[in-house]
Amino acid sequence: MSVIGWLQISLLFLAVLVVVKPLGLYMAGVLSGEPNVLSPILGPVERGLYGAAGIDPTREQGWLAYTLSMLAFSIAGFLLLFAILRLQAWMPLNPQGFGNVPPDLAFNTAVSFVTNTNWQNYGGETTLSHFSQMMGLTVQNFVSAATGISIALAVTRSFARSAAPTIGNFWVDLTRSTLYVLLPLAVLVAVAFVAMGLPQTFRASVEATTLEGVKQTIALGPVASQEAIKQLGTNGGGFFNVNAAHPFENPTALSNYLNIFAMLSVSAALLYTFGQLVGNRRQGWAFIAVTYAFLIVGVGIVYWAEAQGNPILSQLGLDPALGNMEGKEVRFGQAMTALYATVTTGLSDGGVNGMHGSFTGLGGLVPMFLIQLGEVLPGGIGSGLYGMIVFAILAVFVAGLMVGRTPELLGKKIEAREMKYAMLAVLILPLSILGFTAISAVMPSAVASVGTAGPHGLSEILYAYTSAGGNNGSAFGGLSGNTLWYNTTLGFAMLLGRFAYAVPVLAIAGSIAAKTRASTSKGTFPTDTPLFAGLLIGIILILGGLQFLPALALGPIVEHFAMLSGQTF
């Protein structure tokens, strides 16, 4: 570790804090329908879309209608993307001449991008045409992120309103999130990426001659535009197989900084947006403080673990001064790789600039554990906010038990109905992750896809289902996931992680919205204080992480101690 490394990390976190308030206020305004600087340009587009789709923007929906609209839109998106992938050979913009994507891989990929997971069992530059990348994947990068924002906005309204039968209009929320938040930000970031050297072209490839005189074909494509929304929407799916470690997807230290900044800023600002819309900005800052506490500790552990290096390699005579550089890009180094890995898993981004499977046991444990906590730190775009609210509901319930009062969150009483839905949502992740991992660990055909022996082999399976269930998309690279079993089961894990979580959350929103908002009294437990933030951290650790401890003990924890003892597999 070095002072420069810590300065790089600190500056990034400070830069995000600087934009949290202005970006949060902007989103609070545009998502509420207030006029803004883009209204003269995008207002007619918004109204035109409503007219073409036959949507009345003034007609709001109850939680069930909102949920059904969200599910219908997601199903339509899945079917469209699946069709594009299966018919790729006959689609335009296919200069590479790629064939149709096999059905099981097309299912996995379509589910992956519709659920904002972006798990990739393929190499983008060797499998997908420009049409599939742009009209299929990039479109879903926008609308899946907008879907997450919409759900979070519905939950936010439920706390802001009093005795309300509705929580908003899904189609309006989806449209505004796309037009006024994601699209303009993506244009700005894409232009910046082009200036930093990312390709933006319809050419398939360019042929170059290496220093050794060997001809090499270098893949090209519309990379910058996809990279921008990949990060802003916490999607994470790369244009190239090695994601942000590829020099055309992340060429410099500056582009790496912008990648991390883009993926973290919108999700963090949404927490402030929540505070603004419910009339308690301190609540938004309390949530941000919780996320920063986890991220700072997480990046510190990863940075330290990777900087220590691998003692087994040191015993073989390799210089340990640079730490564990296996799977890392020299142009980024230990600090920026550790920061990227921590942020991408604290969010639901899943993009990588280094190979997580090449981290040390302790270094690989942290990214996996952050996903298992529910990716609420600050989590995916939108999904992180409503996931944080679920844990906040559980935290005030525990606080209410301790002081003998009916728990309240922002003036709304938390009763049995909300607790049942909250616990149902929290149990989805371990059920999906541990269930599929256990089955795969004893199936010979599934174990055959594992590329590493010993505890790291179990970690590869556990990380895969953790990533899928947590809608993250990153992976330990030793697992060959492009098989019928993994394509299918990972797809179902992604569906559970997205929709089996979102439906109970929207049910909570409907129940909360119908309650009368009470004024604060002397007996009310404040939820915008350091005390509550500490309680929330404890609840996230206990309910979000403790259930995975036995599995982690058999995987990365054992691997760490095996490395220290010099044992190999």
UniProtKB/Swiss-Prot annotation:
Location relative to the cell: Cell inner membrane
Native organism taxonomy: Bacteria, Pseudomonadati, Pseudomonadota, Alphaproteobacteria, Hyphomicrobiales
Record GO terms (molecular function): P-type potassium transmembrane transporter activity; potassium ion binding
Protein name: Potassium-transporting ATPase potassium-binding subunit
Stated family: Belongs to the KdpA family.
TM region positions: 11-31, 64-84, 135-155, 179-199, 258-278, 285-305, 384-404, 423-443, 490-510, 531-551
Description of how the protein assembles with itself and partners: The system is composed of three essential subunits: KdpA, KdpB and KdpC.
Keywords linked to the UniProt accession: Cell inner membrane, Cell membrane, Ion transport, Membrane, Plasmid, Potassium, Potassium transport, Transmembrane, Transmembrane helix, Transport
Cellular component GO terms, alphabetical: plasma membrane
Organism of derivation: Rhizobium meliloti (strain 1021) (Ensifer meliloti)
Residues making up the signal peptide according to the UniProt record: none
Summary of the function given for this chain in its UniProt record: Part of the high-affinity ATP-driven potassium transport (or Kdp) system, which catalyzes the hydrolysis of ATP coupled with the electrogenic transport of potassium into the cytoplasm. This subunit binds the periplasmic potassium ions and delivers the ions to the membrane domain of KdpB through an intramembrane tunnel.
Keyword Metal-binding: no
Topology of this chain in the membrane: Multi-pass membrane protein
